[in-house]
Regions:
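Acidic/glycine-enriched connector segments
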Residues: 1-140
Length: 140
């Protein structure tokens, strides 16, 4: 099993959707990627999740997991495709997203990113993924 995760700025433009679609489909059809981990913050995550759901109609074997940065509250729509990383309950709220991002990097082979600035959480996550030897694909 080969996995991919995603990092991007909260305020990404919808114009990257086609590139995102192409890159994900390329990973599925040419590189055997069948597991996708995605966060739950911002427009990049929402757009990526929508693209993955659309691709799952054609590639029935792929698995899509939403990885939470915070423990779900009672009454949250807890679905089978949700992962809570081990140790997240001990992470300070300020660092919970970093903890979640590190988990996604550690469990992935590829990273698809939309990063246009040299600061912020998405930038830091991509830099960490590079240091860990992950294959980075930029969508800009």
């Amino acid at each position: 099993m080969t996995a991919c995760t995603f990092f991007g700025h909260r305020d990404c433009p919808s114009s990257i959707k086609e590139k995102l679609y192409e890159e994900i489909e390329q990973l599925i059809s040419h590189h055997g990627v069948d597991i996708f981990y995605i966060g739950t913050q911002g427009s990049f995550d929402r757009m990526t999740y929508a693209v993955l759901e659309d691709l799952r109609k054609r590639y029935l074997h792929i698995k899509i997991y939403r990885v939470l940065a915070y423990l779900p509250k009672p009454g949250d729509n807890d679905t089978a495709d949700t992962i809570v990383p081990e140790g997240i309950e001990n992470a300070y709220p300020r660092y919970a997203i970093v903890h979640r991002n590190n988990w996604m990097i550690d469990h992935s082979d590829y990273v698809i990113a939309y990063v246009t600035r040299t600061f912020g959480g998405a930038y830091q996550a991509v830099e960490r993924a590079k240091k860990k030897g992950k294959i980075i694909i930029q969508t800009r």
